């Protein structure tokens, strides 16, 4: 099966919060509820003496939001408009300020584009085996493969069948072959990278916007991708 979607993984150093006394009405974590966030992007600081890139991770207080350059924004807006708001987010580097940057505010997620027939999940069950004076001191765990027919079934299972020590782990994730979106965002699978199509990957590379980023095939599990013997070596020497 051909690879049709990739995780756009950003390895440029994470921006840091540039504190400004009296700064008000600033963004925080994204709520993943589709409601547009209120406020302005807090000032973001990157390392001195590094050339600018087109993608950055935002400071940790902003969670999974991404910082992108104006030219990336223009590329993305040419091919899809309704799923992300782009909020001005100047980048500070020493005494310099670069205004041509934006931070993402995702208002539409595409979890229904996941192919549940091909995707694989693991049920990670945890429980308390022993307590001392009411304090858990010994735990048990079990890992089993689990299948879901659709997104609703997965959400319902997680809501009603799991205790606080258990979770569903995504092992391999496939996007439907008939998905037409060039890039998507997901919220229910523990993957918060921008997911992009092969064509968009090619466009980013051709326009030399790929400094400090890598494209991990979405279908390859993390444990098979990284490490000294991982499949990443086939893509990045």
Indicate residue ranges for each PLM-predicted region.
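Aromatic- and glycine-enriched beta-alpha-beta binding-site module
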Residues: 60-126
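N-terminal ordered "arm"
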Residues: 1-61
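Intrinsically disordered, low-complexity boundary segments flanking structured domains
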Residues: 41-43, 71-74, 87-93, 170-171, ...
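Extended, non-catalytic structural segments that build the interaction scaffolds
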Residues: 57-64, 188-192
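Acidic, proline/glycine-rich low-complexity IDRs
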Residues: 18-22, 113-237
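Short beta-strand micro-motifs in enzyme catalytic cores
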Residues: 4-6, 100-102, 192
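A structural signal for short, well-ordered beta-strand segments and their strand-loop junctions
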Residues: 7, 83-88, 195, 214-217
């Amino acid at each position: 099966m051909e690879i049709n979607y990739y995780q756009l993984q950003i390895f440029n150093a994470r921006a840091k919060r540039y504190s400004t006394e009296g700064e008000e009405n600033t963004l925080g974590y994204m709520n993943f509820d589709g409601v547009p966030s209120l406020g302005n992007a807090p000032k973001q600081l990157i390392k001195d003496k590094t050339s600018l890139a087109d993608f950055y991770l935002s400071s940790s207080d902003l969670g999974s939001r991404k910082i992108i350059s104006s030219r990336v924004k223009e590329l993305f807006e040419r091919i899809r408009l309704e799923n992300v708001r782009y909020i001005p987010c100047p980048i500070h580097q020493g005494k310099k300020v670069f205004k041509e940057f934006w931070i993402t505010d995702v208002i539409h997620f595409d979890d229904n584009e996941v192919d549940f027939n091909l995707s694989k999940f693991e049920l990670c069950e945890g429980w308390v085996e022993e307590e001392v004076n009411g304090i858990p001191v010994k735990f048990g765990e079990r890992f089993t493969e689990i299948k879901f027919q659709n997104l609703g079934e997965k959400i319902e299972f997680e809501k009603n069948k799991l205790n606080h020590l258990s979770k569903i782990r995504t092992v391999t994730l496939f996007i439907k072959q008939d998905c037409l979106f060039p890039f998507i965002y997901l919220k229910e699978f523990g993957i918060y990278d921008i997911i992009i199509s092969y064509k968009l990957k090619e466009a980013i590379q051709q326009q030399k916007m790929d400094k400090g980023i890598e494209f991990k095939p979405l279908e390859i599990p993390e444990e098979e991708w990284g490490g000294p013997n991982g499949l990443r070596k086939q893509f990045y020497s």
